[in-house]
Amino acid sequence: MSSQAPENTPSTKGLFGLFCLASYLLSLSYGTTFLLALMLGSHGGSESDAGTVISVAMLSTFLAVIFSGHLTDIIGAPRAIAAGGLTLMIACIGFAMTPTYGPALLIFGLILGFGWGVFYTLGPIIVAMIIEPARRVKYFALLSGSMMSGIGTGPLAGRGAVAMGYPVESAFVVAAAASLLGAVVFFLIAPKIRLQQAVLGPVAVCRITTGAAARVIRSKAFFPIVMVGLGGAIFGGLSSFQTSYAALHHLDYSLFFLGFMCAAISCRLLIAGFIVKRDAYLSSCVLTSLMIVSILMFVFSVESPFSYLLAAIILGVGYGLTYSVINGLAANEAPNGLTAQSLLLFSLSYFVGVFGFPLLAGKIIVAYGMPSLLYTILSVSLLNGCIALGRLAWRKVAVAAIA
């Protein structure tokens, strides 16, 4: 009973609200990377160049995921995220000042990857530290909804800037200012988060070791970790080159981000509480099927603004809720004492997909065209669906064998 009391106080709710606000502000920086293809294209670059800049961030995210736990043990997770926010600010300023492809842009991509990796990894771990397992999925949904709001706002800021006569680079300036503000908020709320952790119990060690990683991989948590990587590839592949897809079909790319963002956020904030009470295996199976339906629409039936918006909404529902469900599975199916390590590997897998896949995606577009990329993404989504369906079927077989 005492473990829940602190979470229901107005001060705690206000703290979590500030936590989500700061997360929203930092997330704008990643959202603006979806404008790189548009920005580079206007300066003689290609989708392959944009994919290279995005994917180079994967290298620094590896370091961020591996060392974020050690950094947390030294200065605490909130201050580590604040430091990551400052690197996001530097990266966005660099993107705004370097609109052409070259070594400088790759360096800023590396800087972005480190900052985003620290933030994205430690955010859920803070939730896991201060929320008991029975309530984690709900709070993961609230956090991820805030982050998705920021991610979606990034490209919309670019569309708004262009509509007002400003260059698309203006969106990166806005994201830099938001990152600075988010970093300040995280620094200011760090003492309150530390106090909340002290009230609820000792903080788990966040260091990742080879032995801990091996134990997590041998557990059931391995499957949601793989699924989030595949889901990240789907999301990264579609979002990073949505400006190119929209131009090819004479559509406004802001419709995709608006539809996707509104659907994902609404589902995570309004429906996630209902989904939490359902069978997680069945839910992941149904939701991955929605993602497949959406991609089929992008391949075969998007011909008008309405169908474009509808496909984005269906993708937002499927992806938005699937992420929340498997994030909870990665935490709750982890071996005893290794929840934080499982979430670190979960984040690492996500980064491999969301940052690594655009490198391949950009080369596919340049060499074979957008349709080939869509078929590749469809194949990835089918594999993801097979894993979800296989887990559900295997459990039924296991239950029948026991009975």
Residue ranges with predicted function:
Residues 171-187, 374-389:
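Symmetry-related core transmembrane helices of the 12-TM Major Facilitator Superfamily/SLC fold
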Residues 2-13, 193-225:
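Juxtamembrane intracellular "pre-TM" segments in multi-pass secondary transporters
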Residues 31, 58-66, 151-152, 261-269, ...:
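Residue-level signature of mid-helix packing/kink "hotspots" within the transmembrane helices
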Residues 110-145:
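Cytoplasmic helix-loop-helix junction between adjacent transmembrane helices
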Residues 9-58, 223, 227, 232-245, ...:
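Helix-loop boundary and gating motifs at the non-cytosolic
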Residues 64-76, 267-280, 365:
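Helix-to-loop junctions at the C-terminal end of transmembrane segments
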Residues 104-118, 307-321:
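Hydrophobic core of transmembrane alpha-helices in multi-pass small-molecule transporters
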